C-alpha cells in the first residue's frame, strides 16, 4: 500500500525516531511500528538497538546497519540510494533524538540536497525534559551541547555566554562536572539560578535546584553520578549590560597589540591579528588591522 504499517509514513522516506533516554516505557507506538516495519534501521549502536527491541518484546526484521559519528558521512549516500529505490530508512541513536549530539545530521543534509523526503517520529529529549523540570524560563533558551573538555576553552566558551539573556542548557559528564561547576562559579558568579538534572526518567532521577554556588557545593559534598543536564538562568539586564564588551578605539587596540607582542614575543602584525580578533566592534565586525598597525607606528614617532 506504499505506507509503513501503522505509522502513515510513505515508503522511500528517511525517518528520524527518538528512543527512550532511560525509561523503556517512553518508547512511542510509532517507534515500535517503525522498528518492526522499516526496511533498513541505521543505529548508532546495533547492540543497544537489539537490547531495546528485546525489552519491548519485538523483532527488528529489517536490515540493521551501524551508523555512528565515525562513519555517518560515508554511509549516508548508500542509505539514500536505497531510499531512492523505495526503502524506508529508520535512523535511531542510543538515546533521544538523532542529530541532537548524536549521528543523523549528515543523512538529513544529503537527503535534502538529493530531494528525498525526511520526517521525524518525535519522542524523549533530555534537553526538553531538563528545561521543563528546572523551573527556569522556557520561552527562550539556547542549547550548547557539551561544554569543552579543556579548562581554557571551557572558560572562553562561558565568557562568551556571560551576557546571554536566554536560559542556557548544557550536557555534562560525571568525569568533568566538578571542574565545570568550578568554572561556572568563576565566570558566571555565585547567584544565578540553575538546575542540575541527572538520570532523567530513570529510577534515580534527581533534580538539584539552587544558585550556582549552592549547586557547586552540592557537587563537592555529594558528587552526582550518571548522565547530567545543566540548566542555567540567562543573564539579567544588568548582568548583560555589565558583561557586554566595550568597543575599543584603534588607539586602544594598538596599545594592547604592543603589550601582546612584548609579553608573548610575537611579531607586531601577529599580535595585532590576535587582539583585533579578540575585540570585535559593537556591530560584530573587526577593526581594520592596517589602521591598528598605523596607530602602532604613530606611537613610536
Predicted segment positions?
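Glycine-rich, flexible N-terminal cofactor/catalytic loop recognition
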Residues: 1-68
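A contiguous loop/helix-start segment that scaffolds small-molecule binding in enzyme catalytic cores
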Residues: 3, 11, 88, 167, ...
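Generic beta-sheet signal
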Residues: 13-17, 85-93, 141, 166-170, ...
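Short active-site oxyanion
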Residues: 35-41, 115-119, 167-168
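General beta-strand structural signal in soluble alpha/beta enzymes
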Residues: 43, 118-123, 170, 196
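Conserved helicase motor
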Residues: 65-74, 146-150
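Short Gly/Thr/Asp-enriched flexible loops that form oxyanion-binding sites at enzyme active sites
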Residues: 99-114, 181, 185
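Class I SAM-dependent methyltransferase SAM-binding "motif I" and its flanking Rossmann-like core
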Residues: 106-164
Amino acid at each position: 500500500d506504499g505506507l509503513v504499517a501503522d505509522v502513515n509514513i510513505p515508503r522511500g522516506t528517511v525517518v528520524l525516531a527518538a528512543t527512550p533516554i532511560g525509561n523503556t516505557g517512553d518508547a512511542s507506538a510509532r517507534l515500535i511500528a517503525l522498528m518492526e516495519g522499516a526496511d533498513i534501521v541505521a543505529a548508532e549502536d546495533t547492540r543497544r538497538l537489539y537490547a531495546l527491541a528485546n525489552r519491548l518484546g519485538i523483532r527488528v526484521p529489517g536490515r540493521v546497519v551501524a551508523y555512528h559519528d565515525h562513519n555517518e558521512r560515508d554511509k549516508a549516500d548508500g542509505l539514500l540510494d536505497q531510499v531512492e529505490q523505495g526503502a524506508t530508512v529508520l535512523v535511531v541513536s542510543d538515546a533521544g533524538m538523532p542529530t541532537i549530539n548524536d549521528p543523523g545530521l549528515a543523512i538529513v543534509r544529503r537527503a535534502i540536497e538529493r530531494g528525498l523526503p525526511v520526517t521525524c517520529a518525535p519522542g524523549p529529549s533530555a534537553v526538553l525534559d531538563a528545561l521543563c523540570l528546572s523551573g527556569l524560563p522556557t520561552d527562550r533558551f539556547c542549547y550548547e551541547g557539551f561544554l569543552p573538555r579543556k579548562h581554557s576553552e571551557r572558560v572562553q566558551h562561558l565568557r562568551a555566554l556571560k551576557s546571554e539573556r536566554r536560559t542556557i542548557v548544557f550536557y555534562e559528564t560525571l568525569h568533568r562536572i566538578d571542574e565545570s561547576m568550578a568554572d561556572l562559579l568563576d565566570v558566571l558568579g555565585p547567584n544565578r539560578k540553575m538546575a542540575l538534572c541527572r538520570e532523567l526518567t530513570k529510577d534515580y532521577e534527581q533534580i538539584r535546584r539552587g544558585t550556582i554556588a549552592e549547586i557547586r557545593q552540592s557537587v563537592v559534598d555529594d558528587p552526582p553520578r550518571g548522565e547530567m543536564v545543566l540548566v542555567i538562568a540567562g543573564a539579567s539586564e544588568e548582568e548583560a549590560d555589565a558583561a557586554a564588551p566595550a568597543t575599543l578605539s584603534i588607539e586602544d587596540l594598538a596599545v594592547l597589540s604592543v603589550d601582546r607582542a612584548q609579553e608573548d614575543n610575537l611579531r607586531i602584525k601577529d599580535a595585532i591579528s590576535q587582539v583585533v580578533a579578540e575585540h570585535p566592534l559593537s556591530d560584530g565586525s573587526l577593526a581594520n588591522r592596517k589602521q591598528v598597525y598605523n596607530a602602532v607606528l604613530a606611537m613610536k614617532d
